[in-house]
């Protein structure tokens, strides 16, 4: 993981707009005030930026992944709907999820004995752990969490 970097598109204390184009006709932008950390892993470019609206946000290859103030819109429905439908979840597999938000939600279930987090890129976990504690809320330190790093498909195929 690389050391924190200063903003590349704005000087410290000023603003810039991060733009994510989703199609030729649609996209969104978000004002960022600081590039808090940046890492170029062998697989992708990971940034942690500060935004006035959403607090700290993670971007991967220029795409917004999660932020401190809206992560629940994503993690809670993704975890709780299947967990409620199941009725008594005791173990779960999170594919991707290196920000730790889904793992945190799963670990809130008192009978959850084991959560496996299968993530391609260790640097995503390291950046989230260091910069997004409001998203993972300590999930990475829970002894019920096991991390598998690398090819997720190969991992699933190796499971019994």
Question: Over which residues does each language-model region extend?
Answer:
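N-terminal auxiliary segments of SAM/dcSAM-dependent transferases
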Residues: 2-57
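The AdoMet/dcAdoMet-binding core of the Class I SAM-like
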Residues: 7-18, 41, 66-160
